[in-house]
Amino acid sequence: MAKETFDRSKPHVNIGTIGHVDHGKTTLTAAITTVLANKGLAAKRDFSSIDNAPEEKERGITINTAHVEYSTANRHYAHVDCPGHADYVKNMVTGAAQMDGAILVVAATDGPMPQTREHILLARQVGVPQLVVFMNKVDMVDDPELLELVEMEIRELLSFYDFDGDNIPVVQGSALGGLNGDAKWVGTIEQLMDSVDNWIPIPPRLTDQPFLMPVEDVFSITGRGTVATGRIERGVINSGEPVEILGMGAENLKSTVTGVEMFRKILDRGEAGDNVGLLLRGIEKEAIRRGMVICKPGSVTPHKKFKAEVYVLSKEEGGRHTPFFNNYRPQFYFRTTDVTGIISLAEGVEMVMPGDNVTISVELINAVAMEKGLRFAIREGGRTVGAGQVTEILD
């Protein structure tokens, strides 16, 4: 099949299907592509091609994920679906599949189940901004009062985890009916995609966010000054703009960018995704090192203490073979560098086993420029033993 060119004329949104095992997430994913393919907006994907998701390695963690893409009249979507519950946990916690929103699938025959709850909690913890609900298998329930009850339960659960349970769209339908082209149920799939279009926000573009670049390397050019290299994480930098240098012991370092170097040419600007060298006025080479960040003044602050949601690699994934306990001191790899930190477990948690996902508090020995949502790996002797993201800043 010819690869379609990425259509940039429509806004791009990353979404995924979440919910309890066997509630119909993969069937729904197949149904969405089938219904949209009939309108010429997607390539049809059958159940088995999505269900046999290839293994991917993200920071050494093995995750099975199916990536599907499709468009509606208004947007272009990249959609992730995971075959197993553990894959969801890893995907969401490590941020391997960044979601701007998600479709929560709940079978009307069962109502909310343990993984329904866990996925909603994870979505809240890792900052998925909005959810839309697809109540599946409605064709197998005869009692309209039961459907009402299940919907009420779902809404209460969403509100409990601080989502807008009163107003979130809940679409009742049948994924299998939609997949089989049954007109009544195809309509519910179309209704679902309208809800996704209208309810899930378009993410702010990286170039619209405040400038930030993690420093990878530093050198000096005779007669020109100090150059810091790295990949711009977000925002735009123009020659002549002021910047601040933070983290890893940087004390009140401010400078002005006098040039942006890319492919050995001096440019006037760099933007998110570019690998650049920034010429910095009045800064000694010794003052900057890998692991610091260069950013728009006042946009980020360095911190040492934070809470995080973490996935701990299993032994099979090359992680630890034994549990860790309170006051465990591994390295935390943020952006471009390792910083030692001390882990405190929540009250009542004695230890953490390989393969667990857990909420921890951390105190680093050096402050790092961070904010909610920042991802990191946990390493021990150079190998990755966990991954996670910051859920709350504590200092």
UniProtKB/Swiss-Prot annotation:
<dbReference type="Pfam" id="PF03144">
    <property type="entry name" value="GTP_EFTU_D2"/>
</dbReference>
<dbReference type="InterPro" id="IPR027417">
    <property type="entry name" value="P-loop_NTPase"/>
</dbReference>
<feature type="region of interest" description="G5">
    <location>
        <begin position="174"/>
        <end position="176"/>
    </location>
</feature>
<dbReference type="InterPro" id="IPR031157">
    <property type="entry name" value="G_TR_CS"/>
</dbReference>
<protein>
    <recommendedName>
        <fullName>Elongation factor Tu</fullName>
        <ecNumber>3.6.5.3</ecNumber>
    </recommendedName>
</protein>
<dbReference type="GO" id="GO:0003924">
    <property type="term" value="F:GTPase activity"/>
</dbReference>
<feature type="binding site">
    <location>
        <position position="26"/>
    </location>
    <ligand>
        <name>Mg(2+)</name>
    </ligand>
</feature>
<feature type="region of interest" description="G2">
    <location>
        <begin position="60"/>
        <end position="64"/>
    </location>
</feature>
<keyword id="KW-0547">Nucleotide-binding</keyword>
<dbReference type="InterPro" id="IPR004161">
    <property type="entry name" value="EFTu-like_2"/>
</dbReference>
<comment type="function">
    <text>GTP hydrolase that promotes the GTP-dependent binding of aminoacyl-tRNA to the A-site of ribosomes during protein biosynthesis.</text>
</comment>
<feature type="domain" description="tr-type G">
    <location>
        <begin position="10"/>
        <end position="205"/>
    </location>
</feature>
<keyword id="KW-0251">Elongation factor</keyword>
<comment type="subunit">
    <text>Monomer.</text>
</comment>
<dbReference type="Pfam" id="PF03143">
    <property type="entry name" value="GTP_EFTU_D3"/>
</dbReference>
<dbReference type="InterPro" id="IPR000795">
    <property type="entry name" value="T_Tr_GTP-bd_dom"/>
</dbReference>
<dbReference type="GO" id="GO:0005525">
    <property type="term" value="F:GTP binding"/>
</dbReference>
<dbReference type="InterPro" id="IPR005225">
    <property type="entry name" value="Small_GTP-bd"/>
</dbReference>
<dbReference type="InterPro" id="IPR050055">
    <property type="entry name" value="EF-Tu_GTPase"/>
</dbReference>
<keyword id="KW-0963">Cytoplasm</keyword>
<dbReference type="InterPro" id="IPR041709">
    <property type="entry name" value="EF-Tu_GTP-bd"/>
</dbReference>
<feature type="region of interest" description="G1">
    <location>
        <begin position="19"/>
        <end position="26"/>
    </location>
</feature>
<comment type="similarity">
    <text>Belongs to the TRAFAC class translation factor GTPase superfamily. Classic translation factor GTPase family. EF-Tu/EF-1A subfamily.</text>
</comment>
<dbReference type="InterPro" id="IPR004541">
    <property type="entry name" value="Transl_elong_EFTu/EF1A_bac/org"/>
</dbReference>
<feature type="binding site">
    <location>
        <begin position="81"/>
        <end position="85"/>
    </location>
    <ligand>
        <name>GTP</name>
    </ligand>
</feature>
<dbReference type="InterPro" id="IPR004160">
    <property type="entry name" value="Transl_elong_EFTu/EF1A_C"/>
</dbReference>
<keyword id="KW-0460">Magnesium</keyword>
<feature type="region of interest" description="G4">
    <location>
        <begin position="136"/>
        <end position="139"/>
    </location>
</feature>
<feature type="binding site">
    <location>
        <begin position="19"/>
        <end position="26"/>
    </location>
    <ligand>
        <name>GTP</name>
    </ligand>
</feature>
<dbReference type="InterPro" id="IPR009000">
    <property type="entry name" value="Transl_B-barrel_sf"/>
</dbReference>
<dbReference type="GO" id="GO:0003746">
    <property type="term" value="F:translation elongation factor activity"/>
</dbReference>
<keyword id="KW-0479">Metal-binding</keyword>
<keyword id="KW-0378">Hydrolase</keyword>
<dbReference type="InterPro" id="IPR033720">
    <property type="entry name" value="EFTU_2"/>
</dbReference>
<feature type="region of interest" description="G3">
    <location>
        <begin position="81"/>
        <end position="84"/>
    </location>
</feature>
<keyword id="KW-0648">Protein biosynthesis</keyword>
<feature type="binding site">
    <location>
        <begin position="136"/>
        <end position="139"/>
    </location>
    <ligand>
        <name>GTP</name>
    </ligand>
</feature>
<dbReference type="GO" id="GO:0005829">
    <property type="term" value="C:cytosol"/>
</dbReference>
<dbReference type="Pfam" id="PF00009">
    <property type="entry name" value="GTP_EFTU"/>
</dbReference>
<keyword id="KW-0342">GTP-binding</keyword>
<dbReference type="InterPro" id="IPR009001">
    <property type="entry name" value="Transl_elong_EF1A/Init_IF2_C"/>
</dbReference>
